[in-house]
Amino acid sequence: AEFTVTQAINIVRHFNHVQRKMRLHDFRWEASILSQSIKDLKVAVIGTGHIGGIVAQIFSEGYLCDVVAYDPFPSEHVKPYVTYKQSINEAIKEADIVTIHMPSTQYNNYLFNENMFQMFKKGAVFVNCARGSLVDTKALLSAIEQGQIKGAALDTYEYEIGVYTTDRSEEGLNDPLLEELITREDIIVTPHIAFYTEEAIKHLIFDALDATMEVLNTGTTELRVN
């Protein structure tokens, strides 16, 4: 959740562009790096499960943002921080930041496509720290090129399997679409690392050990998925 908020702010504050200027020793305060105050922005959280709910809380309580949300199963724990909308379209249409937090299913592949991006408020920021298959990457790039979307932070990518977690510094990517994402200043791309903290890795290890002991003792585990 904290990673999502950080990346959203980095896009709003033109982080990549500022860093490029710094590397060039260009320290001018130009219109291209003028930003907005986060507290003045409306945020749409699509999917308010555990992570989405925390994102909503951080934006609402930490930054005093107006937060709207959509989830087919609204959470009572999240309601103090958001105004739930009846549809995704209604949630995104006036949002300055749209962040998505939902699992990948057979029903939501390319949910965020050309038609969906055209419903965004012009100049909105898009954040995907959920699943790459939710987003039509080419449609997103087109929306950014047209100025419909200001920029995006992507911790997931639809073709990441077999690429992310590997070192391609010698052999190259052979993926023009990912290359374009990486080289653009208005997009921040990271290799699915939002979860990658010391605390999270500890939890993964302990959960695996607990599940192993549970299977040995009972023949099954509450973490069983099949």
Residue ranges and their predicted role:
Residues 1-42, 54-57:
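Phosphate-binding beta-alpha-beta segment of Rossmann-like dinucleotide-binding domains, i.e.
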Residues 32-122:
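Rossmann-like dinucleotide/phosphate-binding beta-alpha-beta segment
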Residues 1-3, 78-81, 95, 161-165:
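Short, charged, surface-exposed secondary-structure boundary motifs
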Residues 1-3, 7, 49-50, 55, ...:
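Mid-domain beta-loop-alpha active-site segment that forms a flexible
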Residues 22-30, 78-85, 106-111, 133-134, ...:
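Short gly/ser/thr-rich secondary-structure transition/capping motifs
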Residues 7, 99-104, 128-129:
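Short, well-ordered coil/turn residues at beta-beta hairpins
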